[in-house]
Swiss-Prot record:
GO terms for molecular function: nucleic acid binding. This is UPF0102 protein tll1737. It holds the Pfam family UPF0102. InterPro entries: Restrct_endonuc-II-like, tRNA_endonuc-like_dom_sf, UPF0102_YraN-like. Belongs to the UPF0102 family.
Amino acid sequence: MRHVGDRGEAVVAAWLQTQQCQILAQNWSCPWGELDIIACDPGGVVLFVEVKTRGSYNWDRDGLDAISPSKQRKLILAAQAFLESQPQWQEHPCRFDVALVRHQRGAYHLHHYLAQAFTLDSIK
């Protein structure tokens, strides 16, 4: 299953680069979990991108339902850990995005990109 996720993340990273984003890290891990993609957009905003890759027929709205409030909290804690470990990015504004990738018969494509899918306030 990790292979499917890796392919989906590669599609999203490539798309972000076409949007002039700089990829800062992929699969960054800490005790809180893993951040799929960390990027910086042309305006200097640090993007924490959660990628969900699913087949055409799935039960969780292409992975969107898997981004529960609990998952959001873990992503926020992981993002804080990343920023603590990388002080050069601490003063930049940050955003939490979700990328939904579909795969069918070996083909992967970015189905939907949700910029600012959730915020610190959305999980209170």
